[in-house]
């Protein structure tokens, strides 16, 4: 099986992507946000989409963890990922390794 990238949700301001990594059976979440499009209201909207749609979608496919790897020097990205419930568990090659059990 090859690595597969799938769009889980997309609108004008945000793009939730998911990588299914072959050989290790894990999911890596990517969150791309249009610059200047972020607000507390949008966070609440996207957090709800993550909790109510994306997590159940992944659970239904027998995944029990979600991973993210923001750059070490991107503190904003790390804070944002923490807001979605992921926590840091290590660092490697300039990346912060984060995960959430679902």
PLM regions: where:
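Low-complexity, intrinsically disordered Gly/Pro/Thr-rich segments
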Residues: 15, 76-89
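Conserved beta-strand-loop-alpha-helix junction that forms the acyl-donor binding cleft
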Residues: 66-78
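Conserved acetyl-CoA-binding loop-helix of GNAT-fold acetyltransferases
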Residues: 40-57, 79, 83
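Conserved acetyl-CoA binding element of GNAT-fold acetyltransferases
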Residues: 24-40, 96
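Conserved beta-hairpin
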Residues: 3-17
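A conserved beta-strand-loop-helix scaffold within acyl/acetyltransferase catalytic domains
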Residues: 14-26
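Conserved catalytic-core motifs of GNAT/GCN5-like acyltransferases
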Residues: 87-99
């Amino acid at each position: 099986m090859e690595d597969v990238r799938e769009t889980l949700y997309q609108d004008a301001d945000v793009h939730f992507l998911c990588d299914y990594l072959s050989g290790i059976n894990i999911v890596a979440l990517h969150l791309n946000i249009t610059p200047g499009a972020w607000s507390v209201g949008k966070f609440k909207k996207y957090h709800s989409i993550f909790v109510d749609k994306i997590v159940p979608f992944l659970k239904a496919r027998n995944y029990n963890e979600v991973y993210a790897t923001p750059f070490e020097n991107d503190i904003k990205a790390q804070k944002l990922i923490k807001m979605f419930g992921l926590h840091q568990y290590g660092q490697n090659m300039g990346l912060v390794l984060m995960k959430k059990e679902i």
